[in-house]
């Protein structure tokens, strides 16, 4: 692992059920470390950790730390936190009072990365998808790859896969500025956008954070199609889905539909071959091109890559088909930034277009259900949210998921709905998933294509619906 850690170290995660925290915890267990953690919400990840031997508490009180200290008396206790953990957290306060070691999750992930040839995916959008595509290709092409990501990778059915391998694919979080803590052999920057207004004041601060990450990478792979990466970073390793001249890796689409994208693949301007991508959407094509480029940078043959692209799948909650209720098609997506909503609605339109062109029944509508995430993000991007959401045929906006933020400016979802109404009269504010469930058949009709978007707890809707309806999936 790292000289700073030994197997006499014990790790206690406050908020262990989070998708990123649980992945790091799983990695430590696989590496032989003892792990415990607490979370107020028990989920699939906490159950998996229990199965692997972790001690999981469903409360966050100082007695938990006392128990861990007594059970692992001959170990050095490391309390692991994310930026989401508040200063007043009882476990964290107890650790501080007793001068126990407190480490940010980024420090632990960085230490794990030191044992591998690391390929790290950073960027404002598409990190989890790109991490999934790269993990899948490296696994199938080399059988010598591990992964720690912020999403469930289909090939592993997990957010962490740790073995004694050469390569490690990691997803790097920029939201809190800890991106500077990582040293990577190959750093991949998908794109850069202004987001995370709770931490950054403007795009320049975001760029500064990414530049610190880039300076710590041995090699850098950047998206030529993003103006912020193109204009602010220098690297001979670039990818594009728009241009091939003087670009190291390009995949130019010529067939785009709801089932696949077919494109011409180039390296350094030279045509190599046609590639069939079984994942729709131009944003996904860009993410896959990044994964292909990274594989080529570590020496994977193009022949192996092409053969295994047919196995590529999106991670969970990324345009994920959930099922069908009485001829209403339902998808989930993690989109919570205006640009992500744009990409998701554009992709959904491909499905609507295909279905309506072949269906003699009443044409379906594109219904967008959106749970805004963070008051600061809504305040910063409200007009951009309105612009993109208005493009759906029908829009339902639920209460804002605060993610621990205080609503200082008294912002609510009705404000978003009122502005959307000026562009699209088919907009309604709803309280939550339970109200959607109660009114589901009044809110929808046969042949509707429903896309449920957000980064909060909105994806619990389908488990609520299944308790009342027959969900065919």
Curated annotation (Swiss-Prot):
It comes from the Bacteria. GO terms for cellular component: cytoplasm. It catalyses: UDP-N-acetyl-alpha-D-muramate + L-alanine + ATP = UDP-N-acetyl-alpha-D-muramoyl-L-alanine + ADP + phosphate + H(+). Pathway: Cell wall biogenesis; peptidoglycan biosynthesis. Belongs to the MurCDEF family. Cell wall formation. This is UDP-N-acetylmuramate--L-alanine ligase.
């Amino acid at each position: 692992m790292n000289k700073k850690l030994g197997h006499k170290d014990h790790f206690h995660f406050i908020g262990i059920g989070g998708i990123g925290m649980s992945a790091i915890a799983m990695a430590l267990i696989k590496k032989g470390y003892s792990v415990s953690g607490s979370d107020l919400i028990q989920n699939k990840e906490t159950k998996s950790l229990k199965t692997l031997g972790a001690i999981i508490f469903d409360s966050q009180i100082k007695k938990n730390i006392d128990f861990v200290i007594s059970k692992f008396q001959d170990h050095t206790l490391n309390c692991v936190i994310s930026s989401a953990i508040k200063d007043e957290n009882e476990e964290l306060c107890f650790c501080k009072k007793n001068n126990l070691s407190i480490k940010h999750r980024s420090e632990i992930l960085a230490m794990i990365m030191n044992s591998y040839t690391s390929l790290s995916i950073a960027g404002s959008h598409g990190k989890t998808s790109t991490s999934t595509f790269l993990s899948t290709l490296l696994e199938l092409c080399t059988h010598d790859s591990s992964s720690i990501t912020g999403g469930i990778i289909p090939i592993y059915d997990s957010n962490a896969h740790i073995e004694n391998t050469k390569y490690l694919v990691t997803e790097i979080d920029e939201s809190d500025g800890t991106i500077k803590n990582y040293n990577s052999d190959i750093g991949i920057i998908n794109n850069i956008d202004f987001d995370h207004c709770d931490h950054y004041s403007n795009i320049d601060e975001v760029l500064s954070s990414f530049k610190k990450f880039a300076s710590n990478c041995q090699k850098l792979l950047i998206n030529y199609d993003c103006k912020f990466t193109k204009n602010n970073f220098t690297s001979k390793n670039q990818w594009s889905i728009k241009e091939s001249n003087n670009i190291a890796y390009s995949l130019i689409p010529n067939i785009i539909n709801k089932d696949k994208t077919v494109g011409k693949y180039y390296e350094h301007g030279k045509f190599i071959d046609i590639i069939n991508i079984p994942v729709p959407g131009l944003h996904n094509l860009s993410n896959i091109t990044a994964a292909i480029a990274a594989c080529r940078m570590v020496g994977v043959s193009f022949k192996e890559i092409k053969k295994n692209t047919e196995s590529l799948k999106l991670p969970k909650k990324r345009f994920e088909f959930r099922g069908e209720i009485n001829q209403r098609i339902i998808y989930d997506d993690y989109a919570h930034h205006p640009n992500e909503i744009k990409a998701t609605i554009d992709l959904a339109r491909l499905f609507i277009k295909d279905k309506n062109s072949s269906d003699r029944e009443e044409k379906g509508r594109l219904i967008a259900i959106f749970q805004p995430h963070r008051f600061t993000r809504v305040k910063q991007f409200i007009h951009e949210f309105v612009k993109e959401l208005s493009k759906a045929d029908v829009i339902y906006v639920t209460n804002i998921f605060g993610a621990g933020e205080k609503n200082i400016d008294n912002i609510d979802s009705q404000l978003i709905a009122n502005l959307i109404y000026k562009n699209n009269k088919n907009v309604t504010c709803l309280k939550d998933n339970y109200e959607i469930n109660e009114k589901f058949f009044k809110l929808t009709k046969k042949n509707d294509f429903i896309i449920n978007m957000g980064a909060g707890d909105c994806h619990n809707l389908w488990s609520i619906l299944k308790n009342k309806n027959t969900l065919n999936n």
